[in-house]
Amino acid sequence: MKKIEGIVPVMLTPFTPDNQIDYPGLEKLISWYLKEGVDALFAVCQSSEMQYLSLEERVELARFVVQKVEGRVPVIASGHISDDLAEQTKELQAMANTGIDALVLVTNHLDPQNQGSETFYAHLNHLLKTLPADMPLGLYECPAPYRRLLSDDEFSFCANSGRFVVLKDVSCDLPTVERRVKLAQGTPLAIINANAAIAWPAMQAGSKGFSGVFTNFHPGLYHWLYHHGAQQPEKAHELSLFLSLSAVTETLGYPKNAKIYHQRLGTFASEHCRVNKDNVLEKFWGLSVLLDQIRD
């Protein structure tokens, strides 16, 4: 069982102008992540526009990433976008056969109507019985279609089951991260914070890395913060402020703004998104300059 920790980018999905997955561009993007020193890759997630990918595309995407990474870092993926439990089971079983190192369950699909713990446990226990017993699992408090945070009891149940190796924590709340780190002690479950504003204090509190959207802009800086920040605390504090303020740019048309960023880097050719059809450079005045400043 591979550990999932460190800097874990939520991968973009490059598309061609005619709305097909740009696999040559994706291969270059994978190379870029690896050169930046990432510790794992989250291949099919919200940043990947998974809600706008067919099941065939999601499976092919995960398999492609696994093949191109060639074991250099762990690859995790989610990809269940249905509320219906039978459809979720089908989606997750297909994803489990792609060669990924951990299969990530989206918490809002374990409780689609926000009915509470009874529904959550019923869905979760069904999946635990039907998914391969030797497949490491993860949890992801994905913000869409709604952010379904785990209660402490639900979190502890998952941690103590021994099946779960990673939680992408989207609480965006340092006390919650601190509490979960304590609850997970003695279990395989690593908490990885996804909120840039608390990235550094969360790491200091025991978050095993970072998995926010700005891993698509400067994962190398997050890598330094996680792996070397403790040796230079003043520099780490200053860097954490820059990273926090930079991440506000997410609100200006993400993920299309990240694709424009990579288009300018030469990673891939098209900014095309399925989730965002806006001309974000016109909609958000000053975005073009901000993207250049982040790059520099």
Annotate the PLM regions:
Residues 2-147:
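Active-site beta->alpha loop and helix N-cap motifs at the rims of alpha/beta catalytic domains
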Residues 26, 62, 88, 124, ...:
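A general structural signal for well-ordered alpha-helical segments in protein cores
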Residues 8-12, 36, 207, 214-296:
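C-terminal alpha-helical cap/extension of soluble enzyme domains
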Residues 53-55, 115-118, 179-180, 204, ...:
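Short secondary-structure transition/capping segments
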Residues 49-50, 111-112, 175, 200, ...:
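Short secondary-structure capping/turn micro-motifs that flank functional sites
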Residues 25, 57, 119, 123, ...:
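Soluble or luminal CAZymes and related metallo-dependent hydrolases
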Residues 128-132, 142-252:
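Catalytic alpha/beta core domains of metabolic enzymes, predominantly
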Residues 60-68, 92-102, 155-164, 227, ...:
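Short, electropositive alpha-helical surface patch
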